[in-house]
């Protein structure tokens, strides 16, 4: 391997990968206790970019990083028409993180742990069909929570490195209210958690 510079400096990069997880949904009517819980499995592809800064002191590396991801992570469930059918789907169109990093560098490699703030958009589509009539409601809510994970990077040229990374992302609980004609309001507390695995390429300034 050719001689490489250290890890100190700003960098930008791109990444791609996938994610899977669960959206836990608790349903209640007009503030009453929850009457049903639905755990909705979700999975899909992700892709995006990151920007960050590293500071190296001996083998120790400290850093900050922010990323933003486009996502196709989603899940859905349907009930048979007996005589009312219902369809419920949730997706994560985008999400991002802002994290601290701490790692150990040796011979062009960097192993690190990371954690911090996570945020994202949770899109929900709920519909009910009875005979010829269908009622559908679409909501978009912003989730806020935390993330933790780790990864490895290796220098492939003086200013370039590749990376692999795992993150556990918890977007917290958001509350959705559905208003269907001639029916009491339905409240839905949804808690989204996902596991993210991705690979990336960084350019260091």
List the predicted regions and their residue ranges:
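Gram-negative outer-membrane beta-barrel domains
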Residues: 1-205
